[in-house]
């Protein structure tokens, strides 16, 4: 069997391989950070990793020199990025012996911010994002059905269970993202894993509201979608796994576009 991909983002902070996890963070590129200076780009990459749960609450970031080397920048550039995250409450930094930067925020996007992001995106852009997401997820699901072993499938089941037991919107957002990342891990593809983290970092804050009253994607629907994907993977049915993943992504894309249109039409009526 093919060597399994390192399970980035689906392990807990206590058993994660820190170096490889932060190496993945350094590979992230997001549209929202395009055109920004390097410090702002790094800040956005770290913010994305926090948003999808790749870096967990209370986790210590690597030493500045080590982290700067991961990103291929000078320590001063990294410090500017960390200062931005610190100012916005994502991390706290303790100086001196035994100090360092610790994640102190789960990357919650407020309902006002989420609505602003959805309103400012065009229908075509949201559809394009959905197309990218479903191309990645369907490939991951198909390959997971072909390549995954019992350990991979058990990990996916645990991720699906974590989503089902999540009660807060931010926990659901992170659990949904981790399930998607878990698919890529089960597909045994590091490149798919990197691509999944990137697209989830962009989509998850648009889908999962911080206020349950503003939720645009049904929790029960996502739970059913996850179950259908997992069942097909366990059966080794590549076609069914691919189809189930496509349906899940179509549900997500439809939710984003419908909410965008409601927001735009609401503005035009006011």
Regions flagged by a language model, labelled:
Residues 1-139, 263:
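Short linear motifs at protein or domain termini
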Residues 7-9, 14, 180, 201-270:
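C-terminal all-alpha effector/ligand-binding and dimerization domain
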Residues 31, 38, 44, 49, ...:
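Short leucine-rich amphipathic alpha-helices used at interfaces
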Residues 51, 55, 145, 234:
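Short, locally clustered residues in the helix-turn-helix/winged-helix DNA-binding domain
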Residues 56-57, 68, 119, 143, ...:
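Short, flexible active-site loop motifs that bind/organize anionic cofactors or intermediates
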Residues 66, 101, 149, 156, ...:
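Sparse recognition of residues in long alpha-helices and their boundaries
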Residues 129, 133-209, 225-228, 240-254:
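Conserved amphipathic alpha-helical segments that form helical-bundle/coiled-coil interaction surfaces
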């Amino acid at each position: 069997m093919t060597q399994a991909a390192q399970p980035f983002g689906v392990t807990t902070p206590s058993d994660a391989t820190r170096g490889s996890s932060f190496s993945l963070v350094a590979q992230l590129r997001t549209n929202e950070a395009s055109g920004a200076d390097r410090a702002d780009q790094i800040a956005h990459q770290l913010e994305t990793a926090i948003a999808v749960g790749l870096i967990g609450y209370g986790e210590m970031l690597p030493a500045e020199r080590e982290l700067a080397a991961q990103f291929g920048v000078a320590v001063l550039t990294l410090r500017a990025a960390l200062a931005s995250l610190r100012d916005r409450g994502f991390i706290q930094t303790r100086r001196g012996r035994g100090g360092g930067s610790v994640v102190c925020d789960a990357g919650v996007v407020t309902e006002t911010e989420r609505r602003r992001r959805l309103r400012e995106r065009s229908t075509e852009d949201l559809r394009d994002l959905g197309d990218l997401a479903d191309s990645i997820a369907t490939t991951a699901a198909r390959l997971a059905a072909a390549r995954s072993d019992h350990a991979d499938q058990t990990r996916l089941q645990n991720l699906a269970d974590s989503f089902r037991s999540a009660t807060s919107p931010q926990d659901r957002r992170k659990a949904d993202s981790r399930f998607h990342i878990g698919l890529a891990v089960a597909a045994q593809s590091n490149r798919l894993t990197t691509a999944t983290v990137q697209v989830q970092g962009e989509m998850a804050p648009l889908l999962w509201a911080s206020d349950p009253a503003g939720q645009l994607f049904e929790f029960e629907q996502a739970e059913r979608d996850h179950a259908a994907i997992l069942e097909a993977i366990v059966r080794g049915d590549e076609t069914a796994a691919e189809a189930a993943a496509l349906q899940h992504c179509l549900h997500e894309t439809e939710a984003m576009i419908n909410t965008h249109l409601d927001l735009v039409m609401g503005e035009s009526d006011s």
